[in-house]
Amino acid sequence: MTLQKKIIELLGVKPLIIPKKEIENRIQILKRYLIENTHLKTLIVGISGGQDSTLTGKLCQLSIQELRKEKKEKSYQFIALRLPYGVQIDEKDCRDAINFINPDQIFTINIKNAVLNSERSLKKQGIQISDYIKGNEKARERMKVQYSFAAITNGLVVGTGNAAENVTGFFTKYGDNGTDVNLISKLNKRQGKFLLKELNCPKHLYLKKPTADLEDEKPQKEDEVALGIKYNIIDDYLEGKKVNSLNKQIIERLYLTTEHKRKIINLG
């Protein structure tokens, strides 16, 4: 078995999807999980205004709406968290995403002071972190806030990572991958767009250039620039299509060198 086939099998990406069916399957799976775990009453998602959190948020809201109607229980709630670092550059996109999702509850927690306080504490001990490391601190701080909300609302933190990010390790270890469940991990970037289109999402939210936007010195740095490869090529690879040898090497090198992010290595 080639490494490409092994990766596709491990990540569970399908070569072809029917968007409507994929949406319904995810809603039913999430509802069933909440029904089986009776202590869980809320779903928590951090909304950035990007494609992945918009899709995840909408799937969560639809799941909760159906569950409330079926169970006649108002305690089921979807909570959308806005977690900017200072002033968000793409503020309008985030507002548009929130309007599209129409969450039951919305909270805005600015993480800037928490991140800066952590940076200052390290500096007092003679430790100077780089802008890149600070970016990862932002991702972890956002997850801390989400888990605080989950703890006080009997909630489940829902991740927003997709298969294209997973294969390349393009996420913060114990940051945006540190979630309870993930609804879109078996979808590549292209397939996520298909689902949002099916859900009548505003086009600009899934046609915009993806960015993690974690670095102060490189605001709105595009994912594809950071990765050194286009998402459509990664998507082709994950769908089992042939990509040229150079791009294949880039993807597989990223996969192998970020394996530690995807699983804990137990040495004893």
Swiss-Prot record:
The protein, known as: NH(3)-dependent NAD(+) synthetase
Main function: Catalyzes the ATP-dependent amidation of deamido-NAD to form NAD. Uses ammonia as a nitrogen source.
Entry keyword annotation includes Magnesium: yes
Organism field: Buchnera aphidicola subsp. Schizaphis graminum (strain Sg)
Cellular component GO terms held in the UniProt record: cytoplasm
Subunit details: Homodimer.
SUPFAM superfamilies, A to Z: Adenine nucleotide alpha hydrolases-like
Cited InterPro entries: NAD/GMP_synthase, NAD_synthase, NH(3)-dep_NAD(+)_synth, Rossmann-like_a/b/a_fold
Record-level GO BP terms: NAD biosynthetic process
Pfam families the record matches: NAD_synthase (PF02540)
Annotated residues for binding of Mg(2+): 52, 165
Family membership noted in the UniProt record: Belongs to the NAD synthetase family.
Sequence positions that bind ATP: 46-53, 160, 189, 211
Chemical reaction(s) catalysed: deamido-NAD(+) + NH4(+) + ATP = AMP + diphosphate + NAD(+) + H(+)
Keywords linked to the UniProt accession: ATP-binding, Ligase, Magnesium, Metal-binding, NAD, Nucleotide-binding
Molecular function (Gene Ontology), one example: glutaminase activity
Gene: nadE
Binding annotation for deamido-NAD(+): 140, 173, 180, 260-261
Alphabetized PANTHER family for the sequence: NH 3 /GLUTAMINE-DEPENDENT NAD + SYNTHETASE (PTHR23090), NH(3)-DEPENDENT NAD(+) SYNTHETASE (PTHR23090:SF7)
Enzyme Commission no: 6.3.1.5
Protein transport is among the record's keywords: no
Record pathway: Cofactor biosynthesis; NAD(+) biosynthesis; NAD(+) from deamido-NAD(+) (ammonia route): step 1/1
